[in-house]
Amino acid sequence: MTKRIALATGGLYQAMSHLQGEVKKASANAGLDEKLIELVKMRASQINGCAFCLDMHAAEAVAAGEAPRRLYVLEGWRETELFTEQERAALAYTEAMTLISDHKDVPEDVYAEAVRLFTEDQYRALAWCVVAINTWNRLMVASHAELPERAE
């Protein structure tokens, strides 16, 4: 892979890191489970093909207590009963937001299920989580970010 200019540096990177910190705080304050957030980050990263973020968030998910088996089958989440109703709603919402250019909107049924299963604060935090991971994915993919020796 051709080496490219690193995009995750400088003041804009610091601003993005600050945004990520605010998203993490909002998620915690809203009572969103850390494992659910990591599933969301992993699913968006799968769709976007971001190996750097997949590596990072798989390690963070396991550290948060996520079962590796669920990570192995995450791409096929609809085909298994391993995910809760709330996790399924979050994953469907993540896919809709990540692939928004396919529909030009979040489908009404996906939105309705998300707001049925999450409080308003949780829904807002979930939306910002999806926005943030999609931004990170694009930065890492565009700059050909290399994997560290060990997932961090």
List the model feature ranges, each with a label:
Residues 1-152:
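Hydrophobic alpha-helical segments
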